[in-house]
Every structure is written in structure tokens, then in C-alpha cells.
């Protein structure tokens, strides 16, 4: 096992950020904001079935994530929400539209997204038995605000800058509930994700939602070394609507019947791998807190090695290494590793960014749309998911992923050929 390396000196942002142009996005009408009083304890905390089903409460007997920093790259976290008071310790805006601390929820479509994500990762709850409590309630949050859409700053540039800022400002874990809706990524991301890898930061990304037309895991989760998170139903089956499939899925986490905090003090039920991802990010924070000697590769190895297999084939294209198990990830005996079992972006760059490198993207199979569905457009956005207000008197808000500019789709995975080779060695 390698000792956890010291954080490197800040590297400058790449002088030229090469970014793919965004496809025009279709914006849906703005929905009524979910500003409402905090719901009663039995309608929020008691709905968090994953705390017991996935060993999170048991893991809290060892640690609650103290001293670990999770960066949320999303639409801007409402740091004043009762469930997040004291959790957000800083942030930054890369969209050009948010406030300087990245804590202004940007909308209209994405206004709820980041706050929901943050609450599942490191929410404190509004009381001992009320509000949403995250998987790592003692971890801290950095909020990096993004804004995606036809009239916004280039999304690729925002993500690259946001990742580098997060690394340079103390993030131990980066949670990405967003996608390019393609398996490849721009060269500007090479610099950003390499910066995270070289500075010992765990990067976790969502595998996407088939319900939004994303049939195949997409970047940033296709980047080697990134832990891709798929979604399962309450019963532990791969979600038909809230999870994409791909050979690079790392672990599965709950993605249906979720509840999260929304700006203004309210809560909403929702589904999608946007929610599964921060749960895993919180569990990664528990592992980092319990095992401070581990580097990022060791943290990821503990998470995938202790996952509960669902099939006899591991990893499986639908379930990866299995269902996340927080208690085992924190406490089980796990063999040490010297390298990230999910690959290395540094090695990938060496192999595939040469002038004479093979064009691996054109040789990969295209995702096949489900029967009766149109393929998802090439678009950048945060994960679309169904969202229903919990507070009485607040109308339900339904978000249809690929039809919203700010909530197009979320996905995650790994470049297929490269990761297949890595896992078979």
C-alpha cells in the first residue's frame, strides 16, 4: 500500500481549455420553487431507508466523516438550508452567474439539484430525528456552482476549472452528478482529472439514467480512475429508469424513493443516479476518515472490494462490483493495493493522446436506445430525475431530464477498451 501522498503545490489552469461545443438544449417552463417549511420528522428522516439497508448507521459507530472535505460540482448549494447549516465551508462559482462562494442556487431548472445532492452526501439534519442526514454528516462541503445551457459559458470549461479549484482548495472527494452524454471527453479534462489523480483526490460520478435516454455510461464517469455509481431500486435491483449500464460501473447505490433537501428549507422525493452518487461520496468520506493512511486508490479499493455482489460475474455491466456496503467499507479486512483498480488517467493520456494513438472512440459500440425511445442528444447537464415535493400545499415538480437545459442527463463510467484491459490484467 502506498502512503497517502502530500498535496502538491497548486498547478495553473491549462493555458488552453479545449472544449466541445454544446448542443442546443430545449428548456422547459420554469417550475414553482419549492420554498416551504421543513417537513415533519416522520416524513423525511424515516424515509431514508438507505441509512440502515446499506450499513451507514453501523459505520457511524466508527466515524461520521470528521475532517473530510467533499466538493459538490453542481448548480450551487443552499448553505442556509436547516439540514446544511455548518456543512458548507466554502466554494466558488465557475459559471459567471453565481455568487463568489458558489452557494447561490442557479436555475430555474437546476435550482434544486445541488442542494439535494449535498444533503445526501453530508447533510446534518435539522435536529436529532428531523431533516435529511447525509451518509457522512460530519464531513464538510465545498460548493462549486455550474450553469449549463445554450446561453451559458461552455460546460466543459466550467467542469475543468471547477475540478482544479476543488483540488487546490482542499477537496478530498469530488462528487459529480453530471454528464456530457458521450463516452469521450475534451482534452481540458485530461488536465483537470490528472490534477485530481496526482493530488490524491477521490472522484465519484453518476452512471446516468436510462429513463432520460442515457443507455450507456458517459463521461465524466468513463474517465479511468473515476468511481462510477449506478442505481438500484429499494429491493436492490438495477433501476430500469434511474440507472444506465456499462462495463465500467463501479458500485450500485439506492437511486429510487430518495428524499433530499431543496433550497428554502423544504424537502422533495426524487430518483436517479444523481442521488446515488453523493451517497457513495459520503461513504467514501467515512472510509477516508476511518483510514487516513489510505491514498485515493486505497479508498476506492475498499469501496469496491466490500460491495455485496449481485451476480456471479464481477464486475457486472449492470451492477459493477455490487451493492455499496458502508459498514464493510469502513471496518472489513481488505487487501492493500498499490494502484487504483479502476485505472489511471495518467496512463490513459500516455496511451491515447499521442499523435499516432488509435481512435478508440470511433471503435466503441454506440449506445442503443430502448425500444420506443429516441437516443439522448449530445448535451451537457445535471441529471434529470423525477422530483415530488413533500410539504403539503406545494405542487409536484416533474423534471424530464433530456428536455431541460440545466438538467439534461447524468452519467458515469469509463472508456471501455482501456478499462476492460486494466481490469483483466
What are these regions (language model features)?
Residues 147-219, 266-268:
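Substrate-binding/access-modulating region of protease and related hydrolase catalytic domains
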Residues 175, 240, 293-396:
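C-terminal subdomain of the subtilisin-like protease fold in secreted/lumenal serine endopeptidases
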Residues 39-77, 350-360, 369-388:
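Extracytoplasmic low-complexity, Pro/Thr/Ser/Ala/Gly-rich segments
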Residues 2, 15-20, 24-67, 82-83:
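Protease zymogen maturation seam
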Residues 221-289:
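Extracellular S/T/G-rich loop segment that most often corresponds to the catalytic His/Ser-adjacent loop
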Residues 66-69, 137-141, 168-174, 198-203, ...:
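Loop/turn elements at helix/coil->beta-strand transitions in domains of secreted/extracellular proteins
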Residues 60-70, 77-90, 104-155, 244-248, ...:
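Subtilisin-like serine protease catalytic core
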Residues 397-425:
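C-terminal membrane-anchoring or membrane-association module
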Amino acid at each position: 500500500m502506498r502512503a497517502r501522498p502530500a498535496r502538491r503545490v497548486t498547478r495553473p489552469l491549462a493555458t488552453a481549455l479545449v472544449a466541445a461545443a454544446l448542443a442546443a438544449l430545449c428548456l422547459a417552463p420554469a417550475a414553482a420553487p419549492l420554498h416551504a417549511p421543513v417537513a415533519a420528522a416522520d416524513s423525511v428522516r424515516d424515509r431514508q431507508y438507505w441509512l440502515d439497508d446499506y450499513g451507514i448507521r453501523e459505520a457511524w459507530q466508527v466515524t461520521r466523516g470528521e475532517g473530510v472535505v467533499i466538493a459538490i460540482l453542481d448548480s450551487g448549494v443552499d448553505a442556509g438550508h436547516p439540514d446544511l447549516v455548518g456543512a458548507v465551508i466554502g466554494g466558488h462559482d465557475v459559471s459567471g452567474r453565481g455568487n463568489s462562494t458558489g452557494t447561490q442556487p442557479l436555475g430555474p431548472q437546476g435550482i434544486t439539484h445541488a442542494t439535494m445532492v449535498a444533503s445526501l452526501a453530508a447533510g446534518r439534519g435539522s435536529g436529532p430525528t428531523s431533516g435529511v442526514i447525509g451518509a457522512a454528516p460530519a464531513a464538510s462541503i465545498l460548493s462549486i456552482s455550474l450553469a449549463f445551457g445554450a446561453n451559458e459559458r461552455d460546460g466543459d470549461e466550467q467542469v475543468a476549472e471547477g475540478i482544479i479549484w476543488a483540488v487546490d482548495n482542499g477537496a478530498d472527494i469530488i462528487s459529480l452528478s453530471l454528464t456530457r452524454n458521450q463516452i469521450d471527453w475534451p482534452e481540458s479534462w485530461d488536465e483537470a482529472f490528472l490534477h485530481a489523480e496526482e493530488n490524491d483526490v477521490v472522484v465519484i460520478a453518476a452512471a446516468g439514467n436510462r429513463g432520460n435516454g442515457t443507455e450507456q455510461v458517459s463521461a465524466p464517469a468513463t474517465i479511468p480512475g473515476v468511481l462510477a455509481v449506478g442505481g438500484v431500486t429499494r429491493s436492490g435491483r438495477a433501476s430500469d429508469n434511474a440507472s444506465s449500464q456499462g462495463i465500467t460501473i463501479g458500485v450500485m447505490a439506492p437511486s429510487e424513493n430518495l428524499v433530499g433537501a431543496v433550497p428554502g428549507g423544504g424537502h422533495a422525493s426524487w430518483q436517479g443516479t444523481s442521488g446515488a452518487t453523493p451517497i457513495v461520496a459520503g461513504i467514501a468520506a467515512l472510509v477516508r476518515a476511518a483510514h487516513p493512511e489510505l491514498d485515493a486508490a486505497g479508498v476506492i479499493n475498499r469501496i469496491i472490494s466490500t460491495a455485496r455482489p449481485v451476480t456471479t460475474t464481477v464486475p457486472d455491466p449492470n451492477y459493477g462490483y455490487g451493492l455499496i456496503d458502508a459498514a464493510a467499507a469502513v471496518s472489513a479486512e481488505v487487501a492493500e493495493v498499490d494502484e487504483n483498480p479502476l485505472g489511471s488517467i495518467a496512463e490513459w493520456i500516455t496511451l491515447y493522446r499521442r499523435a499516432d494513438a488509435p481512435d478508440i472512440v470511433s471503435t466503441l459500440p454506440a449506445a442503443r436506445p430502448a425500444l420506443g425511445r429516441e437516443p439522448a442528444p449530445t448535451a451537457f447537464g445535471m441529471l434529470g430525475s423525477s422530483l415530488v415535493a413533500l410539504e403539503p400545499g406545494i405542487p409536484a415538480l416533474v423534471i424530464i431530464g433530456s428536455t431541460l437545459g440545466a438538467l439534461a442527463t447524468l452519467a458515469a463510467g469509463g472508456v471501455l477498451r482501456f478499462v476492460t484491459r486494466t481490469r483483466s490484467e
